[in-house]
Amino acid sequence: MNDNDNIDKDNIDTMNDNNKLIIGLDEAGRGPVLGPMVIALVKIKGQDLKNFEKLDIKDSKKHSKNRREELFEMIINNYDVRYEILEAKTIDKLMNTINLNKIELMAFTKLINSVLKEEYPNYKENSKIQTATPQIEIYIDACSSNEKAFANQIKSKLIVNDENNIKIIAEHKADENYKIVSAASIIAKVIRDRKIEEYKKIYGEIGSGYPSDKITQKYLANYVEKNRELPEIARKSWNTSKKLLKKIEDKNTVDKIKDSKRIKTNIELKQTKLVEF
């Protein structure tokens, strides 16, 4: 299922800590029709692992909003944090050529490689022959149904290739099983939530942005009815958006037909008056 089936999910191995880097990645906002998807990475040094494991960090969904904010500040102030914000228009553009899993994979590898570039400054661009010195463990919440294939895809795009020292552990629910991934999930969730709050100041109450959210549904329906288009923060490639656009297209077609009939009727009336005259 992963590169190291003997890894204890409750407590990552802390042996040889001084020569180890632990990296966790997760996303927030994969499914919403409104707003961005955020990919986050948290990196800790091996010598900090024991203290990190003692922290009350769980999957972001298991913390209250206030607690997530507290943990967010603690994590970014004590550990290496990186993130990628993919706005709706960026997601739509990428969806023209690749699917959502590949978009997520692309963002994961971009963040991981940003770490590797710093850890191995002498790497050669597009080279796969380097050997890493420290042991690097990368934990990822897998978005693909095939965890092993997902891990291999990530590995194939890394700028450092070392089977002995770089381990990729990609699993479903990794955000529940590994604190380092839980930390990344908190970072991603808080950043997305803050973006949604920014949008509300511009667009009014938009809800959570998820298609199942009644407030989001009402907001989108009203916006499209009024403006005959989707807001900039909407993912136009989502089925929810496509259905709303289809309704507008159908309504525009009906309106054009009505206008055409009205014009035709007016012409006929004018012709009738001329004949009578």
Curated annotation (Swiss-Prot):
Its cofactor is Mn(2+); Mg(2+). InterPro entries: RNase_H2_suA, RNase_HII/HIII, RNase_HII/HIII_dom, RNase_HII_arc, RNase_HII_hlx-loop-hlx_cap_dom, RNaseH-like_sf, RNaseH_sf. SUPFAM superfamilies: Ribonuclease H-like. Gene3D superfamilies: Ribonuclease H-like superfamily/Ribonuclease H (3.30.420.10), Ribonuclease hii. Domain 2 (1.10.10.460). A divalent metal cation binds at D26, E27, D141. GO terms for cellular component: cytoplasm; ribonuclease H2 complex. It is found in: Cytoplasm. Its EC number is 3.1.26.4. Manganese or magnesium. Binds 1 divalent metal ion per monomer in the absence of substrate. May bind a second metal ion after substrate binding. Coiled coil: none annotated. It is an enzyme of class 3 (hydrolase). It holds the Pfam family RNase_HII. Residues 20-250 form the RNase H type-2 domain. Endonuclease that specifically degrades the RNA of RNA-DNA hybrids. This is Ribonuclease HII. It comes from Methanococcus aeolicus (strain ATCC BAA-1280 / DSM 17508 / OCM 812 / Nankai-3). The lineage of its organism: Archaea, Methanobacteriati, Methanobacteriota, Methanomada group, Methanococci.
